[in-house]
């Protein structure tokens, strides 16, 4: 006979323990846990009303408390401090918020604009001169208009204003000429530096070519001498 036909004693003991545990578990659940046999949402009919109160209570009634208080039911067990704070603080129905402004102004300009202004002022200095001449013209014209309203000395003052206008125009042209001269001078300096670099590169290239040419000539001379010696 093979040993597989008879179960081992350890397996039998384990099976008995499992059955005993299941019986105890089922007995404990049946004794401690009670659920109603039926639940009804509609009002009770005449048949249900004929039953006694204790049978209704056990068969179809279920009571669920509205709240469960763990602490605070008596003076010995007060509410926790967090709950006291929550109950003491009044709840506000609405929150007060400031309305945003209708117009938003940019007080501080970003740094990119400053860099663009610096580059424009360096690359285009003639624009500043033009604005200065324009302001001078407007000032002279305003002075001339004010003098015209004064009275008997209008002609002399107008001639003086025209003379000042001519002087401002001449000054503006002189300033533009100075700016053009400075820009031309910078361009000439850049061209001179570029030419110097090109000349140095050409000299170095000529030196390299001379060295390579001398090396190739010496190589061919040595080869020819060796060939003649053979």
From Swiss-Prot:
> What is the recorded membrane topology of this protein?
Single-pass type IV membrane protein
Looking up PANTHER family in the UniProt record yields: MITOCHONDRIAL FISSION FACTOR (PTHR16501:SF17), TRANSPORT AND GOLGI ORGANIZATION PROTEIN 11 (PTHR16501)
- Taxonomic classification: Eukaryota, Metazoa, Chordata, Craniata, Vertebrata
GO MF terms here are:
protein homodimerization activity
* Coiled-coil annotated residue ranges, if any: 179-210
Q: Which UniProt keywords apply?
A: Coiled coil, Membrane, Mitochondrion, Mitochondrion outer membrane, Peroxisome, Phosphoprotein, Transmembrane, Transmembrane helix
Query: What does it do?
Result: Plays a role in mitochondrial and peroxisomal fission. Promotes the recruitment and association of the fission mediator dynamin-related protein 1 (DNM1L) to the mitochondrial surface.
The protein's name in its UniProt record: Mitochondrial fission factor homolog B
Residue ranges that the UniProt entry lists as topological domain Cytoplasmic: 1-210
Pfam families recorded for this chain?
Answer: Miff (PF05644)
Q: Which residues cross the membrane?
A: 211-228
Q: Where is this region: Disordered?
A: 117-153
């Amino acid at each position: 006979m093979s040993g597989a036909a008879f179960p081992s004693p350890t397996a039998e003991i384990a099976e008995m323990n499992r059955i005993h545990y299941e019986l105890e578990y089922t007995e404990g659940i049946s004794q401690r846990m009670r659920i109603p046999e039926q639940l009804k949402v509609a009002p009770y009919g005449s048949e249900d009303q004929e039953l006694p109160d204790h049978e209704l209570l056990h068969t179809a009634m279920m009571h669920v408390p509205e709240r469960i208080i763990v602490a605070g039911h008596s003076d010995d067990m007060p509410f926790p401090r967090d709950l006291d704070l929550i109950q003491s603080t009044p709840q506000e129905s609405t929150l007060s918020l400031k309305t945003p402004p209708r117009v938003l102004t940019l007080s501080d300009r970003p740094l990119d604009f400053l860099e663009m202004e610096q580059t424009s002022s360096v690359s285009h200095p003639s624009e500043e001169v033009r604005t200065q001449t324009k302001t001078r013209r407007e000032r002279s014209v305003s002075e001339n208009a004010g003098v015209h309203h004064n009275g008997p000395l209008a002609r002399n003052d107008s001639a003086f204003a025209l003379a000042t206008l001519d002087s401002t125009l001449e000054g503006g042209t002189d300033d533009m000429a100075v700016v053009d001269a400075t820009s031309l001078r910078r361009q000439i300096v850049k061209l001179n530096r570029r030419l110097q670099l090109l000349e140095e590169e050409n000299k170095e290239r000529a030196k390299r070519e001379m060295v390579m040419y001398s090396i190739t000539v010496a190589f061919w001379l040595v080869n020819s001498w060796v060939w003649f010696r053979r």
